[in-house]
C-alpha cells in the first residue's frame, strides 16, 4: 500500500496516541460518544447528558449511559449540574480531553506535512 497517503499516516499516528500512557484507552463506543460531545463543545454549546445520550442511535441507552460514566471515571469528561435546576446535568470536557484533541490535531497537521 502507498505510504504517502495523509489519512493513513494520520490513522497510524492516532493509533500511537491510543498507546500513550498519559491518555486512557477508549473503545469504539467511548470514542464515538466523546467525538459526538466534542462537536457541541467546539460550537460552545452546553451539552445536556440527555443530548449526549442521543449520539450513536445504534447503541442502546443503557450502554451509552454506562460509557458516559466510564469516560468520567477515565477523566475524559465530567458532569456538572445546571446552576438553576439541579435536575439538569451537563457533560463537559476535562483538561485531559482537551489535551487529547490538541494532540490529535497536531498529529493531523503532521500527517499532512510529511
Labelled PLM ranges:
Residues 1-4:
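General nucleic-acid-binding
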Residues 7-36:
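Short alpha-helical segments that sit at the start of domains
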Residues 9, 17-18, 102-114:
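Amphipathic alpha-helical dimerization/coiled-coil segments
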Residues 37-41:
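Short helix-to-turn junction characteristic of helix-turn-helix DNA-binding domains
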Residues 43-55:
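Short acidic, hydrophobic short linear motifs in intrinsically disordered regions
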Residues 58-73:
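Short amphipathic alpha-helical interaction segments
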Residues 72-82:
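A short, conserved structural fragment
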Residues 82-105:
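Short, cationic-aromatic polyanion-contact patches
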